[in-house]
């Protein structure tokens, strides 16, 4: 009987030592230095993907796993602000990369995607956004339409 009890104790001790090597991992956000990263349930770092925060906002994780901030992401279709939050239902003014100076205006809909190559009605006015997503002004689309200096489509004769 004594040997059986000792064997059970030894078996329990071995089993508990094996359990020490198993690490439970909770998915979620973690700060690593100056960067925020997101881990899956299996402990792997999420990369090149969107993750939704508890407050409902969306953030993008770059190829390194770090949360992107203040930049274009996901094939330049989305923009995240200084807090890493996807811009939605907003205008954004960005330094113009096609000219030596100036700015371009972009509009992001409720899904956060930059409007590209289409007309968008905003507050009852129509704006056209070109292939880069920048708001167009002047004569556009083979000189068929005219958009004033603030991008609003002009209709009728003046």
Predicted ranges, named:
Residues 2-158:
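Extracellular adhesion/carbohydrate-binding repeat motifs centered on closely spaced tryptophans
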